[in-house]
Amino acid sequence: MKKSIKLTLALSACALLGIGATVWAATAAKGHITIPDGYSELVFNDEFDNTGAPDSTKWGFEQGYLRNGELQYYMPGNANVNCADGVLTIEARNDSVSVDGKIIPITSASIITRPAFTWKYGYVEVRAKIPSSLGTWPAIWMMPAENVYGRWPRSGEIDIMEHVGYDPSKIHFSAHTERFNHTRGTQRTHVIEAPEAVGQFHTYGLKCTPDRLTWLYDGKEQYTIDREENSDWTSWPFDIDYYLIINLAFGGGWGGSQGVDINSLPQRYEIDYVRIFK
């Protein structure tokens, strides 16, 4: 699809920017991207202007049955992912494929920026069109590049956007830490009513600073968490590098808590762009 990109700041496609231990070349194939107020550099982006599999220099794949009792098997490569017309599409299917001699009833995909790109502070924005049927669970989220403070939830998790198909008008923003997480019922979560989100493109953003996390929907701030005075890693582990995950789950402890409609598959989750600024 054609993207609306304003000409405001020339960004060289050859300019190399070091982020943590990662060196990255930010590009803007369709034009020059607006730099948000308070930021000076585009340090990672994908406009998905290629055809076929996503750029392997930017994205990796999770594989297998991974978490939350979900029904889908995450496939590697471009089996359930495709780039065309400036959009990346993740498709959850009821296709009964064979993997290592076993029949997998439901497949989907989860793409990640690790190891290509990790970062600590800045602004991440994803423009996406989410699907909705009984069982769908699309998400945009961040996990630690290294478990500096220990395994989940000790090193944190930031959910930029989550949506479950049985409650289609709501978008969820969350952060999980050792002190504040869903297993304790103490997670920091905010829910907005956004009935227009399903089937239309909208932007989902997160601003990360040393002392604050701020979630945005269509460029408007929706939720903020501030670091408590004298807090330690148990409540604020967000001073380490994270990577980005974009996935479409089906079923599981939350997505399938009201049942699933397997006959609704395939379902498609479309990503117009991913941009990260410093």
Summary of predicted features, one role per range:
Residues 2-10:
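Bacterial N-terminal signal peptides that target proteins for export
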Residues 10-20:
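Bacterial N-terminal signal peptides
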Residues 24-278:
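GH16 jelly-roll
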